[in-house]
Amino acid sequence: MTTTSLEAILKEKGNPVQLLRNSRIGMYVYPVVAPEFSNWRTEQWAWRNSAVLFDQSHHMDELIVEGPQAAEFLSHHGINSFANFDLNRAKHYVPVTPAGHVIGDHIIFREREDKFVLVGRAPTSNWLLFCAAYGKWNVRIKHDPRSPSRPEGERVLRTHYRFQIQGPEANKIFEKMNRGPIPDIKFFHVDWINIGSKKVQALRHGMSGAPGLEIWGPYEDKSYILNAILDAAKEAGVDLVRCGSRAYSTNTLESGWIPSPLPGIYTGDGMVAEYRKWLGADSYEASGTIGGSFVSDNIEDYYVNPFELGYDFYIGWKKDDFVGKDALVKMKGQTNRKKVTFEWNPEDVLKVIASAFEDGTPYKWIDFPQPNYASSSADRIEKDGKMVGMSMFNGYSFNERRVLSLGVVDADVQIGDVLTLKWGEAEPTQKTSTEQHKQAEIRVRVSDTPYSSEARENYADSWRTKK
C-alpha cells in the first residue's frame, strides 16, 4: 500500500496500545450525509414509531469478489458456514485471525455462483484484499472504499447507492413504491422490487430492530431513487423521516450489534505479521484510536472473539478448514465473556453533564446522542473495584430515554446486576477528541441484548434500591 507499514510503525513506537491511545486522527466521521435532516430525536423516534430513511451510501467500504474460487476464498477466510448460502441470500460475515480474534464484519450478498458483494467497515475489507494476494487465490476484487471523511467540497462518487427504510409503517411505502404488494422476502434474503421505473434489489433487514428493507443499485440512479421513495411515502400518507448521520450512529444500540471492535491483528506471527507489513501507515489499523478508561499494556486485552459477541452460531464447524478454526475449537471449550447492554443510571449521567457548568475540571463530556470519542471504545466495568467487563459502544436512545452501551461481561455476571462504569481517561493522551477532564463513576444495570423497554421496567426498582 505505502512504503511505510503498520509493522514499521509498531517497531518504531513500541507498544501498540500507546500508539492507538495517542492517535491524533480525530473523531470518527460519518461522511457526506447531513448530520440532521430534522433533529436527531425525531429521527430516532421515527424508526420505532413511523418510518425512517437511512442513507448508507457513503460510510461503508464495498468489495465485489468474483471468480472461479470466490466462494472457496470467502469461506476459507470467514467463520461462516457456506453450506446453505444460495443465490439472493445474505449473511453476517465474520473473519478472525489464526488466533481466533475478531477482525471485523461485513454483510455479504451472493449475486451469482461466482460473485459476492460485501459491505462494511475497513478492517474486513483490508484483510480480504491482503488474503487474496497472500494466498494466490483465483479471484478478482473491486474495492470501493468509503467516502472521504472530509471531502472539502470535492464531488463524491460511489459504485452503488444504498438506502434502508425501516419502521412500523415502512410496508405502506414499499407497496406504494412497488405499485402493489412486495414479495414475501424472508429475513436476510434478497428479491427484486420496483421503485419508479427501476427494478432494484432489496434485502430484508432491520438494523435498529424494526422491520425494513435495504435497497441498492448504480450510484448514478441515487437521486432518482431517493425522489421516488419520498414521493411514494407522500402518496402512502406516511411521514417518512430522513435520518442524518448523528442519529444513524445510534441505531445499533437497540438491536445490539457492536460495530467497531478493535481488529485483533496487532500481534501474531505468520500471515498476521505479513499483514501488518502490507498495511500502510495511513490505514485504519495504523491511524485509528482506542479510547476509554480501560488501559492495559497488552493489546490482546482489547481483542474479542466470536463467542463473546454472540457470533458462535455462525461458525461452520463442518468446513474442512478455515482461518482460525483450530483456535475457535479451543475457545469453544472455555468460559467466554458474553455480550450485554448496559443501561446507564440517569442521575449519574446528569451529574457528569452538570460538571460542565461548575468551576474546576469537569468529568469527560457525554455528547448526545453519540458519546464515543475513539475508533474503538473500551471502558472499564467494575464490581466492587474489580474489572468484570468492558463497555465498547455507547449512545443515547430517545426512544428509551436512556444512555445505553454495548459490551461484554464475565460469564457469572447476571442480567439485572448493577455495576460501575468508569467514564473518562485516568491519564491525558494526545487524542484530539478528548478535553481535559476527570474520571466519573456511573452505575450501569446489566440488560439483555437486544435491549427492550419491557426489560427496563421489570427492573425499575433497581435504581432506587441499589446504590
Residue ranges and their predicted role:
Residues 74-76, 104-107, 119-120, 128-131:
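Short, conserved acidic/polar surface loops in the N-terminal third of protein domains
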Residues 43-49, 95-105, 194-203, 388-391:
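Short amphipathic beta-strand starts and helix->beta connectors
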Residues 1-35, 112-467:
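Conserved, structured C-terminal
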Residues 1-92, 101, 339:
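Acidic, proline/glycine-enriched N-terminal capping motif
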Residues 59-66, 97, 107-109, 116-121:
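Short secondary-structure transition/capping motifs
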Residues 84-86, 95-101, 106-112, 154-155:
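Short, charge-rich binding segments
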